[in-house]
Amino acid sequence: MTKAATKQVEEFTAEAKKTMEEGVEKMAKGVEDVTSFNQENVEAVMTSGKVFAKATEAASAEIIAFSKKSYEDGMAAAKEISSVKSVSEFFEKQTAFAKSAFENYVSEATKLNDIYAAAAKDAFAPMNDRFTAATDMVKAYKA
């Protein structure tokens, strides 16, 4: 083989080696990026789960407190109604209790709705961030 041919083979080999090393580095970086990305996804799911757990805990406490108050209000109303002296007084007290119970129920439903709406917003925020990150990652690899 001539010196020129040997030199060409050496240059080709060096270029192939360089290209292969760059490819391996890019692949390793890609694997590292995917691993990191997946870890961040797991953390986002865990964060969302914690938010929902706290919201469920808050809602449960609210429901228990409401149930206790409703029971106490019902017992007080029953006691008050049992001491009425006339049919009209009975209907007045019964109507007042029903109105109060309904207003309390609507208020409680609003509180629970607020708890769950805030939880949904807060819990989905990390997932939305991960979706944005995934979109950005795909755009970066396409570029």
What are these model-predicted stretches?
Residues 1-143:
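Amphipathic, low-complexity, repeat-rich surface-exposed segments
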